Regions:
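The catalytic Nudix box helix
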Residues: 32-65, 104
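Active-site-adjacent beta-strand/loop module that shapes the phosphate/pyrophosphate-binding cleft
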Residues: 58-59, 68-92, 99-101, 105
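Short histidine/acidic/glycine/proline-rich micro-motifs that form metal-
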Residues: 37-38, 70-71, 107-109
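Conserved N-terminal beta-strand and adjoining loop/helix that marks the start
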Residues: 1-16, 36
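Nudix hydrolase/Nudix homology domain
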Residues: 27-29, 82, 93-134
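Short coil/turn segments
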Residues: 20-22, 113
Length: 134
């Protein structure tokens, strides 16, 4: 089973969405910054590392979103943890994504999300973001 951790970054009442590069599996779809949990690493640690690698930013990882964690994909089993995240720096390098967008809760469904991200998007749309904002 592939273990993945993703950061739901909140700033100024908006959520950071990342569009997967066309050549990657799921290319063109939107997701939250994140990636594989490495051996001897917790999902929270993976989020911090992935935010630094993908965005060039340091992050404060907050609590885990209480959403579905296990998915069966055409490529195998996936376990994903989503975490509310605050950025400590704001470089936003385009390393893993072809594009980034800051979306309001009302705009969340204006982009095509990866299937595994949709339960998190549904929860975010119903959440008061002030608790996780700066």
């Amino acid at each position: 089973m592939l273990k993945v951790a993703a950061s739901v970054v909140v700033k100024d009442g908006k959520i950071l969405a990342a569009r997967r590069k066309a050549e990657r599996i799921g290319g063109g779809y939107w997701e939250f910054p994140g990636g594989k949990v490495e051996a001897n690493e917790t999902p929270k640690q993976a989020c911090q590392r992935e935010v630094l690698e993908e965005l060039g930013d340091e992050a404060e990882i907050l609590e885990r979103l209480k959403v579905k964690r296990h998915y069966q994909t055409p490529y195998g089993s996936l376990e994903i943890d989503f975490f509310w995240t605050r950025l400590k720096t704001f470089n936003l390098k385009h390393v893993a994504a072809s594009e980034y967008r800051w979306l309001t809760k009302e705009e969340l469904w204006d982009v095509d999300w990866l299937e595994a991200s949709k339960p998190a998007v549904s929860l975010i749309a119903q959440t008061n973001l002030e608790k996780y904002d700066e």
